[in-house]
Swiss-Prot record:
The gene is lacI. Repressor of the lactose operon. Binds allolactose as an inducer. InterPro entries: HTH_LacI, LacI/GalR-like_sensor, Lambda_DNA-bd_dom_sf, Peripla_BP_I. It comes from Escherichia coli (strain K12). GO terms for cellular component: cytosol. GO terms for molecular function: cis-regulatory region sequence-specific DNA binding; DNA-binding transcription factor activity; DNA-binding transcription repressor activity; identical protein binding; transcription cis-regulatory region binding. One of its GO terms (biological process) is negative regulation of DNA-templated transcription. The lineage of its organism: Bacteria, Pseudomonadati, Pseudomonadota, Gammaproteobacteria, Enterobacterales. This is Lactose operon repressor. Coiled coil: none annotated. It comes from the Bacteria. SUPFAM superfamilies: lambda repressor-like DNA-binding domains, Periplasmic binding protein-like I. Residues 1-58 form the HTH lacI-type domain.
Length: 360
């Protein structure tokens, strides 16, 4: 179907092309009656303004560019959705460029793509070390930029959740339940967020005189959580609890626990990180560290608008996190396993012994 043009709107409303253009670009010298007539025609014809063309014409509406990690991951997709929701409330538009490869050069390429579309400001949700973040900020030229996945020590404009509080809450929850045999499942250590969470866990476990019995590294995906946890269990390492760096990997870990004949919560407690929308629907529902992505989206758009107007205080802004207690964490050894669960566990042990005897 042929897209509706300004000429179509002008003909339908009985006005000139120039008049429709002035209405679309919110020019002041148009009568209220004429504006209403043109807007009614636009609504009737379902006319969609060309935002890039409006920018080229000098219209001062805000066009926000978002450079983001893969939207196949739950957290980045929810953050982008929250940014779009807030931008829509303010009458702004959003254009997204996904960073397809790893590394600072790929992030710069995404930024250059957005700058070519004449964005008014940039939100960068991609993990960057301090020097890389500074280099990306320099590539933004004179366009204000806000970073969402950097260290709170990076000397740039950023909004991040408190990794310190998030890791402390997870450790304190398990310690309060009585856990001592705790395994860690980190995200990819190329990610600053993954490293900060791992460091935080170590800090607060050490304060409680606990050494993790195992450390594994995933890639944020559920499959990596499954594979890393299954490998750990097959090696005979069975913790009473796991701290996992995001909810998707926690889902995979829960599958591995269940397929190994163990029970999530009763045998191995699991604490996730993020509180993505699906976490309450896991079986059992996941105990996790909540990062409020809706709040992050709203705050980042508001602050970027302030930065573009020279009003915002520059520097780092920390957002709060909280512990959401659900059904995947229990005190260790508080429930008696069912005969079926015991049988499954014995079969798993027999398989492990058989592999050892055969030299596999």
């Amino acid at each position: 179907m042929k897209p509706v043009t300004l000429y179509d709107v002008a003909e339908y409303a009985g006005v000139s092309y120039q008049t429709v253009s002035r209405v679309v670009n919110q020019a002041s010298h148009v009568s209220a009656k004429t504006r209403e007539k043109v807007e009614a025609a636009m609504a009737e014809l379902n006319y969609i303004p060309n935002r890039v063309a409006q920018q080229l014409a000098g219209k001062q509406s805000l066009l926000i560019g978002v450079a983001t990690s893969s939207l196949a991951l739950h957290a980045p997709s929810q953050i982008v959705a929250a940014i779009k929701s807030r931008a829509d409330q303010l009458g702004a538009s959003v254009v997204v460029s996904m960073v397809e490869r790893s590394g600072v050069e790929a992030c710069k390429a995404a930024v250059h793509n957005l700058l070519a579309q004449r964005v008014s400001g940039l939100i960068i949700n991609y993990p960057l070390d301090d020097q890389d973040a500074i280099a990306v900020e320099a590539a933004c030229t004179n366009v204000p930029a806000l970073f969402l996945d950097v260290s709170d020590q990076t000397p740039i404009n950023s909004i991040i959740f408190s990794h310190e509080d998030g890791t402390r809450l997870g450790v304190e929850h398990l310690v309060a339940l009585g856990h001592q045999q705790i395994a860690l499942l980190a995200g990819p250590l190329s990610s600053v967020s993954a490293r900060l969470r791992l460091a935080g866990w170590h800090k607060y476990l050490t304060r409680n005189q606990i050494q993790p019995i195992a450390e594994r590294e995933g890639d944020w995906s559920a499959m990596s959580g499954f594979q890393q946890t299954m490998q750990m269990l097959n090696e005979g390492i069975v913790p009473t609890a796991m701290l996992v760096a995001n909810d998707q990997m926690a889902l995979g870990a829960m599958r591995a626990i269940t397929e190994s004949g163990l029970r999530v919560g009763a045998d191995i407690s699991v604490v996730g990180y993020d509180d993505t929308e699906d976490s309450s629907c896991y079986i059992p529902p996941l105990t996790t560290i909540k990062q409020d992505f809706r709040l992050l989206g709203q705050t980042s758009v508001d602050r970027l608008l302030q930065l573009s107007q020279g009003q915002a205080v520059k520097g780092n802004q920390l957002l709060p996190v909280s512990l959401v207690k659900r059904k995947t964490t229990l005190a260790p050894n508080t429930q008696t396993a069912s005969p079926r669960a015991l049988a499954d566990s014995l079969m798993q042990l027999a398989r492990q012994v058989s592999r050892l005897e055969s030299g596999q």
